[in-house]
Amino acid sequence: MSKRAQDQDEDMREAKSAFNVGDRTTVDDEGMGEFEDPWEDEVESDQEVIIENDADDDEDMDMDQVNNEIEMDQDNENEDKDIRVYLPGQALDKDEVLEADQSAYEMLHSMNVRWPCLSFDILWDQLGDERCTFPATAYVVTGTQADLAHNNEVLVMKMSQLAKTKNDDGNLSDDDSDDDDVEEDPILEHRSMRHNGGVNRVRAMPQRDQQIAATWADTGKVHLWDLAPHIRALDQPGTMVPESSKKPIYTVESHGRCEGFAMDWSETVPGRLLTGDLNGKIYMTTLNCANGAVSPDRVPFVGHQSSVEDLQWSPSEKGVFASCSADQTVRIWDIRSKKRAGLQVKVHNSDVNVISWNKKLPYMLASGSDEGVFSVWDLRQLSQNAANPTPIATFKWHQAPITSIEWHPTDESVLAVAGADDQITLWDFSVEHDAEETLNGTSQKAIVNEAGVEVPPQLMFVHQGQQDVKELHWHRQIPGCVISTAGSGFNIFKTISI
């Protein structure tokens, strides 16, 4: 499966989500790193009614006439919009377009970038955990897929003044706190580092006290970066980033010229990095966080018959990790054995593109495939080379390859999934059918409108509007907040469902 962005348009289209069908709008987006403002024409579109009382005797008549005209205008507007709920799979008429239902979000912002970014990671900050107030702030690191190799960059971005989303009537919800009374435009600040070649994947160390990131380049090299000076420059106006800090602190060359996409840092052992390439080889590199020394292991883990697509360290066992491959398998490895995986299971009938290890339930692993199917596996029930392994849950909701999958950082039953069908879906596996909804042992799914779209009860939310969605992540310090990247730019949102 090719993970590269196919369309790299300089003019990015507006990203919208949780869609209704309404009138077509045209938006021109220019420049790099700009937040979109869906309300910028609000003042011009408002209509003001001016009442002139030339005679006291005519006052009641004039008021009745004005009220009648207002009601007629409102009725006409409602008839013209013809808004209805949209679900993937439904056909749109020629004059219809998808529009976001703002009331479905607590927060929704979209951001355009000059070049598409295939991958990113969210950085720890010092603003506290469990943040639920607005405006919000988030830090991310990402890398570009530019037109020419020397135009690529690693970007450290700070998104601030992320206000609570207005409802479709332009008002904030009734329970908004006082800090929403004065709404300001969102702010994007960034610092950049030149990167040789396109950036296939970016991963930041998960430890709070480390600001180290790794980038997988399409040149076959893996670069390590110290992001601390760039974050300080974003937080302290006037601070300059030394030229020496704009270069990698180390470059891993274990893969030769073979590029890859799979990469993961260990949460249990700081500094341990895994990288997997298109030749099916996996290498481990160790960074000593105390003195900065880097030790690449030149002997790879071998066994996959095709490209390694994703890697995940075990959240509980220091020397165990999982890999998935285009050979349709998931393998569980012990770092003491490089020639043979401890467990090898064929989990899909096509390329296994992504995996995610549940951090709250370490025996749960989710996988997403090239055929649009994603599954949840209980590792305790899997056996070596099982012919027909049975997942505890599997869904074929997405109509194109699964491109990203990630468990919620604190809720073990919630999963986010992204697909090449331009959908991001949020699932809650704690939701089950009531007994009354089950007939003759067969689960009865909801049928939605004339399109006959079956909606699983575990599906909590469908976010759309981005084109060519590549990757998503939950924000660990803002509960329910998701950030995603696509060919059309970034979205940062928080729904009312999760």
Cite the ranges covered by each PLM segment:
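Per-blade loop-tip surfaces of WD-repeat and WD-like beta-propellers in eukaryotic adaptors/scaffolds
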Residues: 160-164, 180-184, 219-249, 266-364, ...
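Hydrophobic beta-strand positions that form the internal "hydrophobic ladder"
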Residues: 140, 213, 273, 321, ...
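Repeat-based blade/solenoid architectures
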Residues: 110-123, 192-199, 255-258, 398-402, ...
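Blade-level signature of beta-propeller repeat domains, shared across WD40, Kelch, NHL, RCC1
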Residues: 471-498
